[in-house]
């Protein structure tokens, strides 16, 4: 069985993440999909980064009744920086009988040649590229082992937009997998943004 690895900050998870995960397990060879939250992304604003445990718990609650999905907290156990190749090596040692596919958005595919050891990633693991608004992928030029999933759903919601809207007091109950999590996220964001003493 092919196991898809969905990396990201999930800051917070939203319905777009779940719609994509559902599509990939129903319309591609992926039988299981593991969410791999990143403790820290050096390219993103850490001031609004929700606590790692909270992000993982929100994902776990959202997927708790779906056996196709699970959360992997492996990156908190690995040294920084959290390069994808290091995480995949660790997973391959922990789960030697699994076949892994790396799921990446078309936006990340555009800069994939700048990823650490990207040639090794492509040589050892399947890459499944999903569409993102504003980014085109020419699947006729993709290397062997890479595939572009044209029909995967694109829901134009971002975690950044969710955080901003929650801080503005907007009602986002239909954007989040768990409507009741909005208050928890709002409280955590206020803590993140309050001056540290």
Curated annotation (Swiss-Prot):
Catalysed reactions, as listed in the record: nicotinate beta-D-ribonucleotide + ATP + H(+) = deamido-NAD(+) + diphosphate
Transport keyword on record: no
Pathway assigned in UniProt: Cofactor biosynthesis; NAD(+) biosynthesis; deamido-NAD(+) from nicotinate D-ribonucleotide: step 1/1
Keyword Ion transport: no
GO molecular function, one term: nicotinate-nucleotide adenylyltransferase activity
EC number: 2.7.7.18
Domain of life: Bacteria
A single BP term in Gene Ontology: NAD biosynthetic process
Keywords: ATP-binding, NAD, Nucleotide-binding, Nucleotidyltransferase, Pyridine nucleotide biosynthesis, Transferase
Functional description taken from the UniProt entry: Catalyzes the reversible adenylation of nicotinate mononucleotide (NaMN) to nicotinic acid adenine dinucleotide (NaAD).
Family, similarity comment: Belongs to the NadD family.
PANTHER family xrefs: NICOTINATE-NUCLEOTIDE ADENYLYLTRANSFERASE-RELATED, PHOSPHOPANTETHEINE ADENYLYLTRANSFERASE
UniProt protein name: Probable nicotinate-nucleotide adenylyltransferase
Annotated source species: Porphyromonas gingivalis (strain ATCC BAA-308 / W83)
């Amino acid at each position: 069985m092919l196991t898809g690895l969905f990396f990201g900050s999930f800051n917070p998870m939203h319905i777009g993440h779940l719609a994509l995960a559902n599509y990939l397990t129903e319309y591609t060879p992926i039988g299981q999909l593991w969410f791999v939250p990143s403790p820290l992304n050096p390219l993103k604003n850490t001031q609004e980064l929700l606590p790692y445990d909270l992000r993982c718990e929100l994902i776990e609650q959202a997927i708790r009744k779906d056996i196709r999905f699970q959360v992997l907290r492996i990156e908190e156990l690995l040294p920084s920086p959290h390069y994808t190749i290091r995480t995949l090596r660790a997973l391959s040692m922990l789960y030697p009988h699994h076949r892994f596919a790396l799921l990446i958005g078309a936006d990340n595919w555009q800069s994939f040649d700048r990823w650490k050891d990207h040639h090794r990633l492509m040589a050892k693991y399947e890459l499944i590229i999903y569409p993102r608004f504003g980014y085109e992928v020419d699947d006729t030029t993709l290397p062997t082992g890479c595939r572009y999933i044209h029909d995967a759903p694109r829901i134009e919601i971002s975690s950044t937009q969710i955080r901003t809207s929650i801080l503005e007091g907007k009602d986002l109950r239909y954007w989040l997998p768990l409507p009741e999590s909005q208050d928890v996220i709002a409280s955590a964001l206020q803590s993140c943004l309050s001056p540290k003493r």
